[in-house]
Amino acid sequence: MSDSKEPRAQPLGLLEEEELITSSMNFFPRDFGFRQTRGYKSLAGCLGHAPLVLPLLFFTLFTGLLVAILVQVSKNPSSQRLDQSKQDEISQDLSQLKAAVERLCRPCPWEWTFFQGNCYFISNSQRNWHDSITACQEVGAQLVVIKSAEEQNFLQLQSSRSNRFAWMGLSDLNQEDMWQWVDDSPLSTSFKQYWNRGEPNNIGEEDCVEFNGNGWNDDKCSAAKFWICKKSAASCSRDEGQLLSSASASPIAHAA
């Protein structure tokens, strides 16, 4: 073990302390406001109490940060009230728009499809042919009667897309092989091309007609199938069109 003792640090003299402070001042930016030629003695006193200065500095910064947070929090209720007021205003506009839309004249009811001045509805449930007629009558419509090749192509496409075999308003219940629509009009000769190959075959008293695949098929009227209703589209007045324009413009103006 060595008997030598570590040298103890000698306290700085006044001149040495001033030189140390003066040389240290070169590390401070000028923006801090410190000058080497003035006030270095007071700075020496502050540095001499560094353990007290740093906590004081941190406390000041923390206090300032806390005050800033409190100010921001105090502003939140006001901004929330403004946001709520804006939301209430938009909600009121939407309610007015909804009421206006409900009063508007629509060519077809919801879930109905418009085509060439008529409205069509493909059911989601199944009934026999006679009950399908009743179902259409209950909504002011008729089990579909086809009047043109364009209408036939449209309905055949709708039936195929929905993958549903659906009743139409055609049967030979009154007289075998005398096909007649529910409005008592006879089947046009030009429409016979729409029968599927080998149809109508009248196997087992098949007297009612359905959309089946890419054409028509006769089946038992007691079979449960989907059905297609048809009714004339409503005509809308000019004023109702203007109502829609004014109602739809209202929320846009407020939301801008």
Curated annotation (Swiss-Prot):
Q: Which residues lie on this side of the membrane: Cytoplasmic?
A: 1-50
Task: Give the protein name, as stated in the record.
Answer: CD209 antigen-like protein 2
| Subcellular localization | Membrane
Sorted alphabetically, which InterPro entries does this protein's record hold? C-type_lectin-like, C-type_lectin-like/link_sf, C-type_lectin_CS, C-type_Lectin_Receptor_IMM, CD209-like_CTLD, CTDL_fold
Species classification: Eukaryota, Metazoa, Chordata, Craniata, Vertebrata
* Pfam families xref list: Lectin_C (PF00059)
Output the Gene Ontology cellular-component terms. Answer: external side of plasma membrane
Q: Where is this motif: Endocytosis signal?
A: 14-15
- The residues that the entry says bind Ca(2+) are 199, 201, 203, 206, 217-218
- What does the UniProt keyword field contain? Adaptive immunity, Calcium, Disulfide bond, Endocytosis, Immunity, Innate immunity, Lectin, Mannose-binding, Membrane, Metal-binding, Receptor, Signal-anchor, Transmembrane, Transmembrane helix
Q: Which GO terms describe its biological process?
A: adaptive immune response; endocytosis; immune response; innate immune response
Q: Where is the C-type lectin domain?
A: 114-230
What CDD domains has UniProt attached to this entry? Answer: CLECT_DC-SIGN_like
User: What biological function has been recorded for the protein in this entry?
Assistant: Probable pathogen-recognition receptor involved in peripheral immune surveillance in liver. May mediate the endocytosis of pathogens which are subsequently degraded in lysosomal compartments. Probably recognizes in a calcium-dependent manner high mannose N-linked oligosaccharides in a variety of pathogen antigens. Is a receptor for ICAM3, probably by binding to mannose-like carbohydrates.
UniProt membrane topology term? Single-pass type II membrane protein
Q: Which residues cross the membrane?
A: 51-71
